[in-house]
Curated annotation (Swiss-Prot):
Enzyme class (EC, first level): transferase
Protein name: O-methyltransferase opaF
Organism classification: Eukaryota, Fungi, Dikarya, Ascomycota, Pezizomycotina
Pathway stated in the Swiss-Prot or TrEMBL entry: Secondary metabolite biosynthesis
Gene: opaF
Protein source organism: Aspergillus ustus
Keywords: Methyltransferase, S-adenosyl-L-methionine, Transferase
Residues the record lists as binding S-adenosyl-L-methionine: 262-263, 287, 308-309
Amino acid sequence: MARGAAELTQTRKVMIKEQLANLTALIDLRIADTPCNGLDDDMPMQPAIDNTITHELAKETYALLHAIKGPSLSVFNFGEQVMHVSAVRALFGLGVFSALPQDRQAMTATALAEKLGCDEELLVRLMRMCTIWGPFKEVGTETYSHTQFSLAYLDPQVTNQFQAFVDEFLPACLQLHKFLEINNGKPPVDATNCPYTLAHQTSGKDMWEHLAQFPKRSKVVNSAMYAISSAHPWPVALYPFREALLQLPPTSSNAPLVIDIGGGQGQAISVIRKMCGGINGRFILEDRPEVLAGIPHTLRGIEKIECDLFKPQPVKGAAIYFLRHVLHDWAEDACVRILQNIASAITDKSTQRVVISEMVLPEKGVTAECATQDLVTLSTTGAERSRKQWERLIPAAGFRVENIYSSEASCEAAIECYLE
């Protein structure tokens, strides 16, 4: 072996050993459960698992993979990842996840293809990739079974999130380079002209207008958003709603207390109302007509009012105007207009406020999860923002940042703003 090649091999060995040592140290730090510091068992103030350790462990695992493969082969990881997603989505569409025995008993490709009415050789080709990286297990020649990871896809909430990401946002993200080429490297600022509209050829419509033409797709996206909010309710409790409302003079039962603007199917406002039990006033959910009409469950003690983010806020004088995961869908100029429409409804600048529940990204060391979410929102003109970006955006709408409530275990935060 030539000296240069030998030195390169030795360098790779050192890198692999270093990465293994890093992983071992992180595994020792990995915690299974963190005591919740919340209002009750149903509403923790922070995630049960410290995500910072989870993400650091995943990051070091990827670094180990790169060290093992080396620079050249690592480039092709991207191709493998895309093909893996493609194969999983195809198998999902064929019905493989539902057809395999849920008790993890093995099934041959022949039996599976016959059950599904699909081509056996095609099935084998797709399962190759999905047994190398998962989620399925290859238990024999052209014989497969479920694993704990593939069974997760049978959860409707997981299913909707997977479909929404792969069918709606992945095509848009893969067109980002083309959008930037067409627009001279400038980020999208118009919801009718962005990577999403380019990928899906929406004919001048924004994402929501486009999806409204396809009820099944729209239902999947709305269900995915509901699943995300339902699975992660704890950020709502970062803001001390009860304490804030109790500091105000007593109100009548007709006074608007909290308005959840763009609140989807009411997950957040339901949590807030529970936190504020016994306090007089109205709790209001606002969203687009089709969203409110599609809520499948009863919202006790919560009013529903149709709204348009880009028109003046219809309910004046509320104690708290709440925006959760709304502004990250929009470019900065649009966010300013949304906040200004809320400002038009504020009648007392000293007591009434806006609370924004969004990510506040660190200036460095952003996790892969947060970076992924940021690029997903970029596809429709939005952004996950840093503190510096929020402190530029909010004053541009005439507000000041009073407090930022956050958790060390996540980038999620609650930004309290008052009108100047």
